[in-house]
Amino acid sequence: MIDGDGFRPNVGIVICNRNGQVLWARRYGQHSWQFPQGGVDDGETPEQAMFRELYEEIGLKQDDVTILATSRNWLKYRLPKRLIRWESKPVCIGQKQKWFLLRLDAAKEACIQFGCHGQPEFDDWRWVSYWYPVRQVVSFKREVYRRVMKEFAAIAMPYLPPVAKKEPRRKGYR
């Protein structure tokens, strides 16, 4: 399912633990790492798609996690031209994503497994510091990651002080 602008509806999943770390997964047979994500099927809500993808990609079930937040908006990224499948119709130029912040029940960490549904998407995972993915994700996804992590920060890490607002500059002062 691709919308009229060429974007495929998709869900992104940020899974955090009680230490404010996030689950970072390595794509199967590759050196690139990312958050779990996947398409929204026809007739499926974003939340239904998120739980389906959570199980298919990570092996976790609805009872293993708690939804802490959902992104306010759909966030879009464009694929690099070299990754666009021009022969497919309709042409998909990128993804629009609804993001979910989940907290994993500490006792359920052992339930993480790959390949619960066909070919696995990932072959390894680890806990990383909250902002690490923004610096490490493939460049064309970086702005979406930055925006979603900024939106979820206060919920994922409530012990952090709020971001200070920039003081307005007064004329004549540097």
UniProtKB/Swiss-Prot annotation:
Q: Residue ranges for motif Nudix box?
A: 38-59
Q: What class of enzyme is it?
A: hydrolase
Keywords for this entry?
A: Hydrolase, Metal-binding
What GO molecular function annotation could you give as one example from this UniProt entry? mRNA 5'-diphosphatase activity
Question: What InterPro entries does its record include?
Answer: Nudix_hydrolase (IPR020476), NUDIX_hydrolase-like_dom_sf (IPR015797), NUDIX_hydrolase_CS (IPR020084), NUDIX_hydrolase_dom (IPR000086), RppH (IPR022927)
Kindly give the PROSITE patterns that the UniProt entry links to this protein.
NUDIX, NUDIX_BOX
Q: Which GO terms describe its cellular component?
A: cytoplasm
Q: Which residues cross the membrane?
A: none
Give the UniProt family note: Belongs to the Nudix hydrolase family. RppH subfamily.
The record's function comment reads: Accelerates the degradation of transcripts by removing pyrophosphate from the 5'-end of triphosphorylated RNA, leading to a more labile monophosphorylated state that can stimulate subsequent ribonuclease cleavage.
Q: What is this protein called?
A: RNA pyrophosphohydrolase
What's the gene? rppH
